[in-house]
Amino acid sequence: MAKKLYIETHGCQMNEYDSSRMVDLLGEHQALEVTARAEDADVILLNTCSIRERAQDRVYSQLGRWRELKLANPEMVIAVGGCVASQEGAAIRDRAPYVDVVFGPQTLHRLPEMIDAARITRLPQVDVSFPEIEKFDHLPEPRVDGPSAYVSVMEGCSKYCTFCVVPYTRGEEVSRPFDDVLSEVIHLAENGVREVTLLGQNVNGYRGTTHDGRVADLADLIRVVAAVDGIDRIRYTTSHPLEFSDSLIQAHAEVPELVKHLHLPVQSGSDRILAAMKRNHTTLEYKSRLRKLRAAVPGISISSDFIVGFPGETEKDFDNTMKLIEDVGFDFSFSFVYSPRPGTPAADLKDDTPEALKKERLAALQHRLNQQGFEISRQMVGSIQRILVTDYSKKDPGELQGRTENNRIVNFRCNNPKLIGQFADVHIDDAQPHSLRGSLLQ
């Protein structure tokens, strides 16, 4: 009987990508098959996120729930990876001594040998080092699960924003070689993938070396990926405004496979707060980039990230953020109350803003962002959208669902499963708060 793997993933798309590669790796080296039930597993993997305090607390809550499983089955291996593992290392076992393996984002390729060593020696295995991009040399070709796929093009970040743990948990920026990324995309396309999302913590900082020694940027990579037979749609995330270049704007204008949607985190509309965050740009510079992009690609959808309640944020600072939202007209975006992360410079800043006021500001900001996003959805009613059909609707098995270029879910009545994995033209009939409804055009 095949041994079972249970994997739980917290956090960003990069973690989702890493988790899929762990499944590939352990399937090839240890013949582990994925199970949906932790109690049936021989190996449990928790891929963690440390971007906010609540996410970190969630890790230990989940590990606590698995403690009884480990007591009932001492042969079970529990492994913790991702950014919490990278940040805390062996200290994880101080709170959860039944954890067998602790590994970082850059050492996931060592999982098979670490699991074997834990079983043989009965000793904990810990490796949270940063061996640059070495892990990709040890991973098998990715399996394909649906028409969309993530492709990691770079790891880490060298921006050192004062609130962010990424440089400390994933290391400095390192780009994958250009040809390695291209080979992965070709493999995915040959196995039915139609849409790829190029991933990096600062993806527009990509600088990949080609086989002839040249250095290619993200715009170069996008143009070559677009030429791969079978790839009809390209996304990328997450970007930094400082490196949103003219060449990338030109790619948006000239490459039809590149979607008319950009996620460009700004974090705040206050120049004073942006300086304290060490974002190294102003709101004027941010808006200038977007004006240039919208001139090149009319109708492009812009989403962003916002942090409310950064230490020292005044009412005027928050008002400036709300003004930026009005000036730009964002699509649905992500926003959070600031969460101090240990080891980051911002964690040492004085913070005298009451928590209740932070939550009040967040609610106001989210309300306006949702209004703007819903207005964009309503403007799409009556239009014909080309969507990539991804699966059956989660609520109605008589419906299929897919995504538009601007990343909206569309549900439409259709009982033809052969449409899954294909593009279809759908007339948008109605806008709902978090999705669209449409009719398939024959």
Curated annotation (Swiss-Prot):
InterPro entries xrefs: Elp3/MiaA/NifB-like_rSAM (IPR006638), Methylthiotransferase (IPR005839), Methylthiotransferase_CS (IPR020612), Methylthiotransferase_N (IPR013848), Methylthiotransferase_N_sf (IPR038135), MiaB_methiolase (IPR006463), rSAM (IPR007197), rSAM_horseshoe (IPR023404)
Residue ranges occupied by any Radical SAM core domain in the UniProt entry: 143-375
Gene Ontology molecular function: any one: 4 iron, 4 sulfur cluster binding
UniProt superkingdom: Bacteria
Domain MTTase N-terminal residues, every copy: 3-120
Cofactor binding mode and count: Binds 2 [4Fe-4S] clusters. One cluster is coordinated with 3 cysteines and an exchangeable S-adenosyl-L-methionine.
EC number(s) stated in the UniProt entry for this protein: 2.8.4.3
CDD domains to which the protein is assigned, alphabetical: Radical_SAM
Keywords carried by this UniProt record: 4Fe-4S, Cytoplasm, Iron, Iron-sulfur, Metal-binding, S-adenosyl-L-methionine, Transferase, tRNA processing
SMART domains the record matches: Elp3
Positions with a binding annotation for [4Fe-4S] cluster 1: C12, C49, C83
GO CC field: cytosol
Family designation: Belongs to the methylthiotransferase family. MiaB subfamily.
Family annotation (NCBIfam families): miaB-methiolase, MiaB/RimO family radical SAM methylthiotransferase
Role description: Catalyzes the methylthiolation of N6-(dimethylallyl)adenosine (i(6)A), leading to the formation of 2-methylthio-N6-(dimethylallyl)adenosine (ms(2)i(6)A) at position 37 in tRNAs that read codons beginning with uridine.
The protein's name in its UniProt record: tRNA-2-methylthio-N(6)-dimethylallyladenosine synthase
Designated gene of the protein: miaB
